């Protein structure tokens, strides 16, 4: 009993880790858990490096879950799609003609199986034809701006309507040798505006697009307008020697009335290059929306060098186009006044009037009468800072949101104002000569105009002069701003 009382009690074993060491170990374990969670649940796996030996082998991937779905049933969210499959495909059922008409609540049923040109048409059934009053206002404002622009450029040596028409009609490649220099004596761009009405939507069978394409038909009428052109020239008799005899000729052409049905349709952009249009032998190639293509159609002028295709920058992506034409049942009434001779004069020769009318009708039908159409590229409507501006008189409301102007831009760089010119007749739109007294033309006899083809002379009232002397056949309002004129706020780079 005495030995058991004096025996010492056993001590409890002390921990080998201190409090600080345990705290640090706990923090480290928490950091490791957080890092593992971020790595396996948030971050993705790096793509394996390309290997020639492993290219033909099947790679096995680990799945974090117990259930591994089959590859054919669904795609894993962690798989990155290819660059060609980022944009979701649009089903063809939502882009065809029937789907568009159904979603816009515009139904069309076939009423005429075939048309004059062998195409199947579908006429509207549930909608009454629109009056297009709002469209007439927009077109009238556009034409009025073109007329003001033509007057503002009347003193320009290169961009005026007078210089453009004179250079186009005196083109040595088109004008015959027995015609002397042609001088424009009178130009009138008119005072009235075309009236569009009776708009209807039809569906036309098109083998290129699925379900056909939609086409808008608009009735247009222009009458009692003051649109005309008058020229003076001489017919040369070069036998037995050059300029053996000269016969003065004065000619005035005006349009009494024009009416017809305008067809407008959209042509979607295609990644494939379009096939070149068939043009008659000896005629220039039709212009495209790319100015580099138009420049390549003309011969190099003096001081120019021909650049290879490798030096040109890559072309932009294909754009959608709008095609317009007139149905063959159009009406174009012309008034032709002529005066031939110096001492003994012949006035208003019927044969000359018939020749001029035939050439004008042929010129018009070769370009914009079905089945021929004019194709115009649609502009880029994506908002850009280079084209951003502020309406006049609202600078204070814009405040700091207006884009900054460069130091070189001034107030004079804005659009020209014509407030002082409304009270008087635009002299640039009418060039008077001695033709009025010789032909007896009054103010009411001047209406629409086309330039005259005589022999190989080509009509040019609706053509545009290129920078190198060649002409393109697409329409452009005479006196408009040059194609190279930048549009937008000066001094601001395009983003």
UniProtKB/Swiss-Prot annotation:
The chain crosses the membrane at residues 23-43. It is found in: Endoplasmic reticulum membrane. The keyword Transport applies. Keywords: Endoplasmic reticulum, Lipid transport, Lipid-binding, Membrane, Transmembrane, Transmembrane helix, Transport. Residues 128-379 form the SMP-LTD domain. GO terms for molecular function: lipid binding. One of its GO terms (biological process) is mitochondrial genome maintenance. InterPro entries: Mmm1 (IPR027537), MMM1_dom (IPR019411), SMP_LBD (IPR031468). It is a single-pass type I membrane protein. Pfam families: MMM1 (PF10296). CDD domains: SMP_Mmm1 (cd21671). Its main location: endoplasmic reticulum. GO terms for cellular component: endoplasmic reticulum membrane; ERMES complex. Homodimer. Component of the ER-mitochondria encounter structure (ERMES) or MDM complex, composed of mmm1, mdm10, mdm12 and mdm34. A MMM1 homodimer associates with one molecule of mdm12 on each side in a pairwise head-to-tail manner, and the SMP-LTD domains of mmm1 and mdm12 generate a continuous hydrophobic tunnel for phospholipid trafficking. This is Maintenance of mitochondrial morphology protein 1. It comes from Penicillium rubens (strain ATCC 28089 / DSM 1075 / NRRL 1951 / Wisconsin 54-1255). The lineage of its organism: Eukaryota, Fungi, Dikarya, Ascomycota, Pezizomycotina. The gene is mmm1.
